Amino acid sequence: MPNKHGNEDEKRYEGRREGYAVIVTVDGRRLNPRFDLWNHSPTGFEWGYGGSGPAQLALAILADHCGNDEQALNFYQRFKWAVIAELPRRHWTQTSQEIDQTLQKLRDTEPILEGVT
C-alpha cells in the first residue's frame, strides 16, 4: 500500500520543535527512540550537533529505515556526523531516498581493512 507520498517504499522523517519539545516522526507517527539498542540520551532526540541526542536520533532513524538493527548499529555514528549534525535547528525532513544515498556514500568511502581478522 502506498504511503501518503504515493510511494510504497518511501518514508518521510520529520523533526520540529514545539516550544521546548522536540518532535520526530516517520510518516506522521512518533519515531521509536530504540533505547533497546543503545541508550545514548534518556532525554530523547536532538540534532544540529554531534552529541548524545543526535546519536540517539541517528540510531532510531537507521533502525527504522533499514529494518536491520545490526546495520543501524554499524552506520549510525557516521550517519550522525554526515546528516544529523548538519540539520537545521527548527525543522527538517529526510526521505528514504536521501537516507539511502547517504548510506551508499558512507559505504563507498569506508576504508578497506586488509589483513584484519
Predicted region positions:
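Short intrinsically disordered terminal tails
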Residues: 1, 111-117
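Long, low-hydrophobicity ectodomains and other hydrophilic envelope-associated domains
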Residues: 2-9, 13
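Amphipathic alpha-helical packing elements
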Residues: 9, 20-81
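Short, ordered beta-strand-loop transition motifs
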Residues: 15-19
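Short, compact, well-ordered microdomains
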Residues: 67-108
